[in-house]
């Protein structure tokens, strides 16, 4: 889990510093003054931080240039997608134990597994476990989506920032989970 958070955090910060995209609420952070905007020079466009009345050393203004990708989205999807995979793996392991084959017991010897193709006794996994293994992993993913959409509704990110953070976080979590939890992955 920690590996997922560290990798996602590093990639997110690298992206924010390389891209430097202004946030949707940048003008509210910048507080430009009419005297600093020369309409003939800038044609009423925000060019750089020089038109801002907020000092460039201000954390608020510096953070205004770190919109892409969304850190909240990437971290939420990173941690909560990992949790979703973990929950799915947990239920998969339980169902494997419940549906394992019955072994033939030979006296005074080790148990011998019946060969493939021969009759084997198996138990069906209880339906509530099957349903739980499909529904419960969705809860963390829905929570991550809620966190991401809240950043859009708060006017802190553009939709593409949210999408990039979502893809980044979910991809890193999926990759790290499948590398470190190979025994829980479902084989097709």
Where are the regions that the model predicts?
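Interfacial segments of alpha-helical transmembrane regions
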Residues: 1-14, 27-32, 73
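Membrane-embedded catalytic cores of phosphoryl/pyrophosphoryl-handling enzymes
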Residues: 33-188
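C-terminal TM-helix exit segments that contain a strictly Trp-centered aromatic cap at the helix terminus
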Residues: 11-21, 153
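Chymotrypsin/trypsin-fold serine protease catalytic domain
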Residues: 18, 22-33, 38-42
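Short, well-ordered alpha-helical segments in soluble proteins
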Residues: 6, 19-22, 91
